[in-house]
Swiss-Prot record:
One of its GO terms (molecular function) is structural constituent of chromatin. It is found in: Nucleus; Chromosome. Core component of nucleosome. Nucleosomes wrap and compact DNA into chromatin, limiting DNA accessibility to the cellular machineries which require DNA as a template. Histones thereby play a central role in transcription regulation, DNA repair, DNA replication and chromosomal stability. DNA accessibility is regulated via a complex set of post-translational modifications of histones, also called histone code, and nucleosome remodeling. The gene is his-48. Monoubiquitination of Lys-118 gives a specific tag for epigenetic transcriptional activation and is also prerequisite for histone H3 'Lys-4' and 'Lys-79' methylation. GlcNAcylation at Ser-110 promotes monoubiquitination of Lys-118. It fluctuates in response to extracellular glucose, and associates with transcribed genes. Belongs to the histone H2B family. This is Probable histone H2B 4. Coiled coil: none annotated. SMART domains: H2B (SM00427). Gene3D superfamilies: Histone, subunit A. Keywords: Chromosome, DNA-binding, Glycoprotein, Isopeptide bond, Nucleosome core, Nucleus, Ubl conjugation.
Amino acid sequence: MPPKPSAKGAKKAAKTVVAKPKDGKKRRHARKESYSVYIYRVLKQVHPDTGVSSKAMSIMNSFVNDVFERIASEASRLAHYNKRSTISSREIQTAVRLILPGELAKHAVSEGTKAVTKYTSSK
């Protein structure tokens, strides 16, 4: 029997489980979305020789979802205050400044600005 290929860092985004309903046809379960692939990529950029457990990955995924939720709700509130029906990059930037502390907010704003500039120039 050949040895199993090393899946040291290969995290699956989601499992597709097949269940048989009453009508006899196979039905796939919905895929669970997560940021695990992207968290893993960042981890490998910062610490190439470090792994992460599934429990730690679940915690990181919850953390990312929580931060995005906070930014989105703050941006929504800002748009509502200013009688705007659209959340623009300006609302997101202000929300990030309000939510994240000090130096972290500065770095997040500069990285966000860089990403938006890169996106608009590639269009």
